[in-house]
């Protein structure tokens, strides 16, 4: 009798364990995924097949109203929502970008409020994911470079997120220029922006240090700081170092290239009105040979020695 009771107890225990495992797997299988989807730079034709397939299976698409209009044919019939209208703007400004323009006490309030709004929004996304819903968060260009999407994802478990890569603005810009960013003996390619390039205590540290080596500098969101960028680079590099600005990279009807060098690029850009949609490229790759075949580039290095070198 005791053996029968023990056997029955063991069977019940095994049954409970198996039920728990099946339930756990079922719950995991039912969980949705949030996809950060690159839609490429410029025209919709740059979007990848995988991105299209991901959008197709999404129950909810998150993107700016501008992107929704730009991709209206692709998003036809989808439920679309703009998360950035509330999360990204404050008094008509992009709060994270213009945070330094606010007084310290107001700055702290803005950060706290935006984090609260973000956390509330993420809480809602978690609920949808738990219900098995798939969400596509669209990102123009390369979603892994200066992407606001990652700020929104901070409250999510990495296992709930998948990144669908795609073409970035730098690739589109170099394609427009018909140049290779690693050409002319470049030892590095740096993707940066003014708020990262200019240090807080020593604003010229990178400009000074990188001028020791041949390389290519690619600046995002740099048009509003183009004067500071050029003037700083001029201190450590020769005036004939090539510079190019590609406006609206990837847009067939808007793409425009302005070429020059550190000595004349500001004059070349004086009549241009666009102050955001442009990629700035600096380096000998714009004019030098793609392959140096091991030859030294001492006569004209990509980022060469300037008058204030070593100070």
What spans do the regions from the language model cover?
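Bacterial N-terminal signal peptides that target proteins for export
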Residues: 1-11
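Bacterial N-terminal signal peptides
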Residues: 10-21
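Class I S-adenosyl-L-methionine
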Residues: 26-45, 49-164
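A contiguous loop/helix-start segment that scaffolds small-molecule binding in enzyme catalytic cores
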Residues: 29-36, 106-114, 130-135, 148, ...
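Short, well-ordered beta-strand core segments
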Residues: 60-61, 180, 217
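Alpha-helix capping/helix-boundary segments
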Residues: 66-70, 144, 169, 225, ...
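Class I SAM-dependent methyltransferase SAM-binding "motif I" and its flanking Rossmann-like core
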Residues: 137-213, 256
